[in-house]
């Protein structure tokens, strides 16, 4: 039998106090909506419908091409939101999962278990529930003396007895698709919120003698709905612990997993060592037996095996195996450091390719450059690549030696085995096997310093 899914993503999220729609706030690198969509994908729905409303086009962009969409122009409650999906799902045979787009911690495994429970028990509706130590703010699951679910009562509508119930509604359900839309035609807004409650269909099913069940989550944390920044931080904390635990199980060493921040799509090979206060974001990949020391920050980059990154930032770049970077280096976007490269302290590389075994030990800027293998950069070298309007390229061939405090003014080519003298400003191409000296000759004026105020002879 086919499965379908409705993701509710139309709300503004007023308590977030943000111009961004609530479901587009990120947890561990991707939006809450994407987390939910990935979990839903585990049940392999024949059709997925996302209900959008507030800033609909922004929300649509996130799942464009992956989901059907329907508009809820007025936010009149969860029941009303599901009504908007009828055009996409009306008349279809099967089970429909309904889930909120602000529940990023739900897992695909739990949703699959929920679907299986629903089908195996032949329910017309199944509620995903959880047991809360503090149930305030949640809808309560009310059962009869036989343990059967009779209704769901929202916090504002609950009496004193019902408020003591700790089994709560997570806001996720599975329904017989046809019966869901039939029942929705019979709900109304006679409640404290003046909204169409999706939960009212449960009472309708019970009144008709139809079977309603509840599947209890094993992990209460999965039920978290994010309505404000406090809950967003909680979700981030839980997700971080999950991610880091998975990497540790897979053979990665963490000095302090509570102080290491890794996005959900990051890939890390076994035997990598990660010290505290490391951040790995986006689509970053780290090869086996690499070491990332305290303070390293890497975004959307590929780090090869056996590399050592020491307290440095790497963005949108590739670092091949055996390279060392840092401390305090900055590898800016579109750079490639090839095998065995050494980039030392206070070196910045931008939009450049650095060849095998090349070394830039300290205090160097390499921008828009093509650098060969076995090149050595002396301290204080700068590629001058920008004239205020255009960027120009510096090309340095294999085994060149760039003397300390060289200024390389692009466009410029330096040939194989060439050398630039320390302190030179190089403006013309340097042929292979040549030495380039671009500095004025030193002149010593003997006795001249005696006339200066600092000289002892001038002191009274």
Curated annotation (Swiss-Prot):
Protein residues bound to acetyl-CoA: 379, 385-386, 404, 422, 439
E.C. code: 2.7.7.23, 2.3.1.157
UniProt-annotated stretches for the region N-acetyltransferase: 251-460
Coiled coil: none
Cofactor note: Binds 1 Mg(2+) ion per subunit.
Record InterPro entries: Bifunctional_GlmU, GlmU-like, GlmU/GlgC-like_hexapep, GlmU_C_LbH, Hexapep, NTP_transferase_dom, Nucleotide-diphossugar_trans, Trimer_LpxA-like_sf
Residues annotated for Mg(2+) binding in this entry: 102, 227
Main location: cytoplasm
Active site: 362 (proton acceptor)
GO terms, molecular function: glucosamine-1-phosphate N-acetyltransferase activity; magnesium ion binding; UDP-N-acetylglucosamine diphosphorylase activity
Required co-factors: Mg(2+)
Taxonomy, superkingdom: Bacteria
Region (Pyrophosphorylase): 1-229
Gene Ontology CC: cytoplasm; membrane
Enzyme's top EC category: transferase
Region ranges (Linker): 230-250
Catalytic activity line of the entry: alpha-D-glucosamine 1-phosphate + acetyl-CoA = N-acetyl-alpha-D-glucosamine 1-phosphate + CoA + H(+); N-acetyl-alpha-D-glucosamine 1-phosphate + UTP + H(+) = UDP-N-acetyl-alpha-D-glucosamine + diphosphate
Function, in words: Catalyzes the last two sequential reactions in the de novo biosynthetic pathway for UDP-N-acetylglucosamine (UDP-GlcNAc). The C-terminal domain catalyzes the transfer of acetyl group from acetyl coenzyme A to glucosamine-1-phosphate (GlcN-1-P) to produce N-acetylglucosamine-1-phosphate (GlcNAc-1-P), which is converted into UDP-GlcNAc by the transfer of uridine 5-monophosphate (from uridine 5-triphosphate), a reaction catalyzed by the N-terminal domain.
Family that this chain belongs to: In the N-terminal section; belongs to the N-acetylglucosamine-1-phosphate uridyltransferase family. In the C-terminal section; belongs to the transferase hexapeptide repeat family.
Protein name per UniProt: Bifunctional protein GlmU
Lineage: Bacteria, Bacillati, Bacillota, Bacilli, Lactobacillales
